């Protein structure tokens, strides 16, 4: 599996951070560099129907090597890394045979500590690939890319029986645009798996229902000395709005299947304030109730304002829980779970407290649960991945292809 590590280190050397608020897709030039590199590598491996769309979706096919009516399946990862932490000049550290305790990240004060990240206790003896404390690592989702590419090579080299295997690498997943320009018909798979999860054994087919809430508050500013009965402080109204939002239903207070309201940004002056919330819930009814709650709060706080002052609230749904689509095709999960068990991995079905391209693709007609990559602590300088976890992911991808061929 030396090639697996080589691929991964090659991919993370490219800065592919996506950028929010940009109209073009992909949002950054660095993503194109990785997409063109992957296109070249897929062609060198002999895959067919290798295409790169003008919106940066790369697709290719490993043709079936056995006859029969075997369903075409897909594996998908994204090329961008999170805008939340620098992805420039990533300098990975390789820690072989981890023996426990803190891992120094580079030459500064940053450490990867089992006190803060207890999962490290479960990884003794493994090879960890970490950051140098200055950037993210990019395992999300370049570990997934390296695993898919390596699995393709294994299928070819070991001549493992399989049907048509479709692969796709998408841009701008981290800014919510990855699946918007995905041509499901062109992909032509019966179902697919995103390889974009976390620790070994994770199999995810439930994600949040998600919405964004943008609130515009228009007040009235006058000199504070003569403000009585005239000033309408937009910042005070913003504070009142947030005070009405349930404090125990925030991200830092919730876990598992619990939903939340999250104030992501707030800025303004006396004259004008803007607030941006995200709403998340696994249950569709509770999700709708949360949206109604925000509307009720805005109405309550805005009651009795001068006509020139107002609160404007816009709610936009982002994505929905893919569970309702995936459970219609239980064999997709059955195959993935069997593949894991065949690789001596106990499947861990858990909800995604976030979103994934697979959620949007599932509602576009391509059922698409999420497989693990072996990575942890995404979107920050404490991100790391285990080489053993990546190797297990490759084994599971290969086994899924093999099991699917046996279903003909």
Curated annotation (Swiss-Prot):
<dbReference type="InterPro" id="IPR011650">
    <property type="entry name" value="Peptidase_M20_dimer"/>
</dbReference>
<feature type="binding site">
    <location>
        <position position="196"/>
    </location>
    <ligand>
        <name>Zn(2+) 1</name>
    </ligand>
</feature>
<dbReference type="GO" id="GO:0043171">
    <property type="term" value="P:peptide catabolic process"/>
</dbReference>
<dbReference type="InterPro" id="IPR036264">
    <property type="entry name" value="Bact_exopeptidase_dim_dom"/>
</dbReference>
<dbReference type="GO" id="GO:0006508">
    <property type="term" value="P:proteolysis"/>
</dbReference>
<feature type="binding site">
    <location>
        <position position="140"/>
    </location>
    <ligand>
        <name>Zn(2+) 1</name>
    </ligand>
</feature>
<dbReference type="GO" id="GO:0008237">
    <property type="term" value="F:metallopeptidase activity"/>
</dbReference>
<comment type="similarity">
    <text>Belongs to the peptidase M20B family.</text>
</comment>
<comment type="function">
    <text>Cleaves the N-terminal amino acid of tripeptides.</text>
</comment>
<feature type="binding site">
    <location>
        <position position="78"/>
    </location>
    <ligand>
        <name>Zn(2+) 1</name>
    </ligand>
</feature>
<comment type="subunit">
    <text>Homodimer.</text>
</comment>
<feature type="active site">
    <location>
        <position position="80"/>
    </location>
</feature>
<dbReference type="InterPro" id="IPR010161">
    <property type="entry name" value="Peptidase_M20B"/>
</dbReference>
<dbReference type="GO" id="GO:0005829">
    <property type="term" value="C:cytosol"/>
</dbReference>
<dbReference type="Pfam" id="PF01546">
    <property type="entry name" value="Peptidase_M20"/>
</dbReference>
<dbReference type="InterPro" id="IPR001261">
    <property type="entry name" value="ArgE/DapE_CS"/>
</dbReference>
<protein>
    <recommendedName>
        <fullName>Peptidase T</fullName>
        <ecNumber>3.4.11.4</ecNumber>
    </recommendedName>
</protein>
<keyword id="KW-0862">Zinc</keyword>
<feature type="binding site">
    <location>
        <position position="140"/>
    </location>
    <ligand>
        <name>Zn(2+) 2</name>
    </ligand>
</feature>
<feature type="binding site">
    <location>
        <position position="174"/>
    </location>
    <ligand>
        <name>Zn(2+) 2</name>
    </ligand>
</feature>
<feature type="binding site">
    <location>
        <position position="379"/>
    </location>
    <ligand>
        <name>Zn(2+) 2</name>
    </ligand>
</feature>
<dbReference type="InterPro" id="IPR002933">
    <property type="entry name" value="Peptidase_M20"/>
</dbReference>
<dbReference type="GO" id="GO:0045148">
    <property type="term" value="F:tripeptide aminopeptidase activity"/>
</dbReference>
<feature type="active site" description="Proton acceptor">
    <location>
        <position position="173"/>
    </location>
</feature>
<dbReference type="Pfam" id="PF07687">
    <property type="entry name" value="M20_dimer"/>
</dbReference>
<keyword id="KW-0031">Aminopeptidase</keyword>
<dbReference type="GO" id="GO:0042803">
    <property type="term" value="F:protein homodimerization activity"/>
</dbReference>
<keyword id="KW-0645">Protease</keyword>
<keyword id="KW-0482">Metalloprotease</keyword>
<dbReference type="GO" id="GO:0006518">
    <property type="term" value="P:peptide metabolic process"/>
</dbReference>
<dbReference type="GO" id="GO:0008270">
    <property type="term" value="F:zinc ion binding"/>
</dbReference>
<keyword id="KW-0479">Metal-binding</keyword>
<keyword id="KW-0963">Cytoplasm</keyword>
<keyword id="KW-0378">Hydrolase</keyword>
């Amino acid at each position: 599996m030396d090639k697996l590590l080589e691929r991964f280190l090659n991919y993370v050397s490219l800065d592919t951070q996506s950028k929010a608020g940009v109209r073009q897709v992909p949002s950054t030039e660095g993503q194109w560099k990785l997409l063109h590199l992957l296109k070249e590598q897929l062609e060198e491996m002999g895959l067919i129907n290798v295409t790169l769309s003008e919106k940066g979706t790369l697709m290719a096919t490993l043709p079936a090597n056995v006859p029969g009516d075997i369903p075409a399946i897909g594996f998908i990862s994204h090329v961008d890394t999170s805008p939340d932490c620098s992805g420039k000049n990533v300098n990975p550290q390789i820690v072989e045979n981890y023996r426990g305790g803190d891992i120094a990240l580079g030459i500064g004060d940053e450490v990867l500590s089992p006190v803060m990240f207890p999962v490290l206790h479960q990884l003794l003896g493994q090879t960890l690939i970490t950051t140098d404390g200055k950037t993210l690592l990019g395992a999300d989702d370049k570990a997934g890319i390296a695993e898919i590419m390596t699995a393709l090579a294994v299928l070819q080299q070991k001549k493992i029986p399989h049907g048509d295997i479709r692969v796709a690498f998408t841009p701008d997943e981290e800014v919510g645009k990855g699946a918007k320009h995905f041509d499901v018909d062109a992909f032509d798979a019966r179902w697919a798996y995103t390889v974009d999860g976390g620790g070994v054994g994770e199999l995810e087919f439930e994600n949040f229902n998600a919405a964004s809430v943008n609130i515009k508050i228009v007040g009235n500013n006058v000199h504070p000395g003569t403000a009585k009965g005239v000033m309408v402080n937009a910042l005070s109204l913003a504070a009142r709005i947030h005070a009405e939002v349930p404090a125990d239903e925030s991200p830092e207070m919730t876990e598992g299947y619990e939903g939340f309201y999250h104030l992501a940004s707030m800025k303004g002056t006396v004259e004008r304030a803007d607030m941006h919330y995200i709403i998340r819930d696994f249950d569709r009814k509770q999700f709708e109730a949360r949206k109604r709650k925000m509307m009720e709060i805005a109405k309550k706080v805005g009651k009795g304002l001068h006509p020139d002052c107002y609160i404007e609230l816009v709610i936009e749904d982002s994505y929905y829980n893919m569970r309702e689509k995936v459970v219609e095709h239980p064999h997709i999960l059955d195959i993935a779970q069997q593949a894991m068990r065949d690789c001596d991995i106990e499947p861990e079905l858990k909800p995604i407290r976030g979103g994934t391209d697979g959620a949007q693709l599932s509602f576009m007609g391509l059922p698409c649960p999420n497989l693990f990559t072996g990575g942890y602590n995404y979107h920050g300088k404490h991100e790391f991945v285990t080489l053993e976890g990546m190797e297990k992911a490759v084994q599971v991808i290969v086994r899924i292809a093999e099991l699917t061929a046996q279903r003909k």
